[in-house]
Amino acid sequence: MSSKLLSMKFMQRARGIDPKQAEEELSKNIVTDEHWSLAGKVDFLPQKMTRNVEYESGYGGLIEENDLESHSNEPNLVQGRASFGLFNKELGEENVDEKDVSKNEEVDVNGTKITDTSELTERERRKQELVSKKAEASRKMEVKAPAKESKKRKVNELSQDVISLHSPKESNARKTKKNKNKKKKKRN
């Protein structure tokens, strides 16, 4: 090493300390991850608290417990959706019919059940109207479709649809002039 490097302060300090003594100082200052402490405070090692934890997949157990507490006199109902859209038509129709019947039943003063059929007929009437409207719309579409395909416009007719300052007579006169000019060019 050079003399300038050896004359620096940190090099002089390193010379004066014994290597064993330096290792001891380093080992005292090493902090392990196992135990941290604050100066001036007594460390109390926390005792491990044990917890009894039960794990269940899903919320089914929680829902059942809450239902038993709040609705103990009601029968167990099936949770979840049994049908969606057109997946299970029979089950969906049964549920709708059961709801309609329960709405239509009224208890008379004597305790006998009276069913109101006016709502059922109203429902059937609405369904028939909807079916007839769909049938009419499909017939109209069938009638309109051939008419569109039967008549095709010519290119000359389309050019007259374009808005212009010239009348149709003037446009015909122009066409004849153009045709004459073309014939002259062909002759030359």
Swiss-Prot record:
GO terms for cellular component: nuclear exosome (RNase complex); nucleolus; nucleus. Residues 120-149 have a biased composition (Basic and acidic residues). Keywords: Nucleus, Phosphoprotein. Pfam families: MPP6. GO terms for biological process: maturation of 5.8S rRNA; nuclear mRNA surveillance; polyadenylation-dependent RNA catabolic process; RNA catabolic process. Disulfide bonds: none annotated. The keyword Chaperone does not apply. It is found in: Nucleus. The modification Phosphoserine is found at S167. It comes from the Eukaryota. Residues 93-188 are annotated as: Disordered. Residues 174-188 have a biased composition (Basic residues). Belongs to the MPP6 family. Associates with the RNA exosome complex. This is M-phase phosphoprotein 6 homolog. It comes from Schizosaccharomyces pombe (strain 972 / ATCC 24843) (Fission yeast). The gene is mpp6.
